[in-house]
Amino acid sequence: MSAEEKNIVRVFRAWKTAHQLVHDRGYGVSQAELDLTLDQFKAMHCGMGRNLDRTTLSFYAKPSNDSNKGTIYIEFAKEPSVGIKEMRTFVHTLGDHNHKTGILIYANSMTPSAAKIIATVTGQFTIETFQESDLIVNITHHELVPKHILLSPDEKKELLDRYKLRETQLPRIQLADPVARYLGLKRGEVVKIVRRSETSGRYNSYRICA
C-alpha cells in the first residue's frame, strides 16, 4: 500500500468518525453517509489521479430536534499544520454561513497563535479542534467504554431535585476527557453513564462536566 493510499484510509476513518460524532450529538446525518464504504469515499473525494481532494471533505448538519443548537460545520484542514491564516478563514466561514458550532480537523498540528483565535470568538460560536489521529477510531464504540448520554437542562434539574443534590456533589468528567470531547460537552452539563452489570443487568451513574 502506497503512502497516499494509507493516507486516504486514515482520512476515511476520521471522516466516518466525524459523521458518527455529529449524529451522536443529535444532528441529522443520513444512513447512507454513515454506511459509506472506502470505495465510495474514494469515488467522491479522490480525483482522477487518485489523490485525496481535502476541499471536498467539509460538511454541515442541522439539528434533528433542538433547533436552538443551530447548524454544525466540519472542515478537514487543507494544510497538515493549521496556522493563523487557515483558522481565520475557518472563523469567517462559520460567520458567513451562520453556523453555531465548527469543528476543524487537522493532520499534524496547530500553532499556538491559531489556537488563541478560538478564545476571541467565544460567545459568537463554538469552535472545537481534533487531530485526525483522535478520530481514526471511534472511542465510544470500544467495548470497554460505557454509553454516555447527555441530559437536557430539564433532565439535569430533575436528577438534582430527585436525589436532593447540589452540582458540586456530582462526580466530575473533565472537559479534556476523550468522551467529553466527542460529545462536545460544556461545563455544567451532565451525562448519564450506562454500565452493564452481571447482577442487575445495567446501572446508571452521572457525571458533571467540569
From Swiss-Prot:
Which GO molecular function entries does the Swiss-Prot or TrEMBL record give?
A: DNA binding; DNA-directed RNA polymerase activity
Phosphoserine carried by residues: S152
Task: Classify the main location.
Answer: nucleus
Entry keyword annotation includes Transcription: yes
Q: Name one Pfam family in it.
A: RNA_pol_Rpb5_N
One GO BP annotation here?
A: transcription by RNA polymerase III
* Gene3D superfamilies membership: RNA polymerase, Rpb5, N-terminal domain (3.40.1340.10), RPB5-like RNA polymerase subunit (3.90.940.20)
- Keywords, sorted A to Z: DNA-directed RNA polymerase, Nucleus, Phosphoprotein, Transcription
**A single cellular component GO annotation:** nucleus
Location in the cell: Nucleus
The superkingdom listed in its UniProt entry is Eukaryota
> Which InterPro entries does the UniProt entry name for this protein?
Arch_Rpo5/euc_Rpb5, RNA_pol_Rpb5_N, RNA_pol_Rpb5_N_sf, RNA_pol_subH/Rpb5_C, RNA_pol_subH/Rpb5_CS, RPB5-like_sf
**Which family does this protein fall into?**
Belongs to the archaeal Rpo5/eukaryotic RPB5 RNA polymerase subunit family.
Q: How does it assemble?
A: Component of the RNA polymerase I (Pol I), RNA polymerase II (Pol II) and RNA polymerase III (Pol III) complexes consisting of at least 14, 12 and 17 subunits, respectively.
Free-text function comment from the UniProt entry: DNA-dependent RNA polymerase catalyzes the transcription of DNA into RNA using the four ribonucleoside triphosphates as substrates. Common component of RNA polymerases I, II and III which synthesize ribosomal RNA precursors, mRNA precursors and many functional non-coding RNAs, and small RNAs, such as 5S rRNA and tRNAs, respectively. Pol II is the central component of the basal RNA polymerase II transcription machinery. Pols are composed of mobile elements that move relative to each other.
Against HAMAP family, the record matches this protein to: RNApol_Rpo5_RPB5
Annotated protein name in UniProt: DNA-directed RNA polymerases I, II, and III subunit RPABC1
**What species is this protein from?**
Schizosaccharomyces pombe (strain 972 / ATCC 24843)
